[in-house]
């Protein structure tokens, strides 16, 4: 499957007739983040790619299309009626946490297969990188486009630093240091926001015993996903930690560690997105 999705997209396995635009507009239970003219189809394009190319569980996407006359995008997808892992985490047993983390680790390994021949850091639609660190008010090719090499990605972060009118001497310092830290990494299709609030959990009643239960997971929030250097997933997962529970202590069991890289990327993120 090509990484880009041809739009409009309509799935062939829709369980019920698709709602009309009028029904969507009048629906009462649509999440605020999926309302209005700001709806971005790239998150669902990412999910379609993951659904097709990996074993990572994501909500089923049934339709992606636009109405240019009113300037709106429409997404029809599976509703996941489950609790977030963040809400349930404190109540889980050690064995249940181990089971969930083992599944997440296996999904991380699966994602690496999708990138073995991929050579460009980019978003799924080959357009602007959507991680906040690359945000600019208007598209800037030097900062948030696709990048052929890891060195070019490093330069993009330095360009973002100077773009925001920060001291050029420190930008020069980053130019000296980053090539020694962010180098030699392979590319991997990256979720980009690996937090337990973005993982939905449901117990499977068919596999429950007196002392154990099987927990099925579905991963949400693929908006910022794309092909990034292999350190990106771990570093962003650590950067997002609030340390209000022990979730951060389990990350090393699900993602490859990049200890040196996370220290530098956290500094950059604080400066470039604050």
Model-derived features with residue positions:
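ATP-binding pocket architecture of kinase catalytic cores
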Residues: 2-141
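An alpha-helical support segment within catalytic cores of ATP-dependent transferases
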Residues: 97, 113-192, 202-214
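Short, glycine/acidic-enriched loop or turn micro-motifs at the edges of active sites
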Residues: 66, 81, 196, 224-225
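The start of beta-strands in P-loop NTPase/AAA+ ATPase cores
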Residues: 55, 73, 186-188, 216
């Amino acid at each position: 499957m090509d990484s880009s999705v041809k739009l409009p997209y309509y799935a062939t396995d829709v369980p019920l007739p698709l709602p009309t635009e009028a029904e969507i507009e009048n629906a009462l239970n649509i999440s605020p983040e999926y309302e209005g003219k700001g709806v971005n189809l790239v998150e669902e394009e990412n999910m379609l790619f993951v659904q097709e190319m990996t074993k990572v569980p994501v909500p089923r996407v049934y339709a992606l299309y636009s109405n240019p006359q009113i300037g709106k995008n429409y997404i029809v997808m599976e509703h996941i009626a489950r609790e977030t892992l963040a809400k349930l985490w404190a109540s889980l047993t050690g064995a249940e946490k181990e089971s969930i983390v083992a599944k997440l680790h296996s999904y991380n390994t699966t994602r690496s297969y999708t990138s073995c021949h991929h050579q460009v850091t980019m978003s799924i639609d080959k357009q602007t990188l959507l991680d906040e660190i690359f945000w600019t008010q208007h598209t800037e090719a030097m900062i948030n486009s696709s990048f052929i090499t890891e060195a070019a990605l490093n330069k993009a972060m330095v360009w973002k630093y100077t773009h925001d009118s920060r001291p050029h001497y420190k930008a020069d310092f980053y130019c000296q240091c980053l090539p020694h830290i962010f180098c030699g990494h392979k590319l991997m299709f990256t979720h980009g926001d690996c937090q337990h609030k973005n993982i939905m959990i449901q117990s499977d009643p068919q596999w429950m015993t007196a002392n154990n239960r099987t927990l099925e997971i579905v991963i949400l929030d693929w908006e910022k996903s794309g092909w990034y250097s292999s350190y990106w997933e771990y570093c962003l997962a650590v950067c997002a930690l609030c340390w209000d529970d022990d979730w951060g202590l389990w990350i090393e069991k699900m993602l490859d560690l990049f200890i040196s890289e996370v220290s530098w990327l956290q500094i950059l993120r604080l400066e470039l997105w604050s």
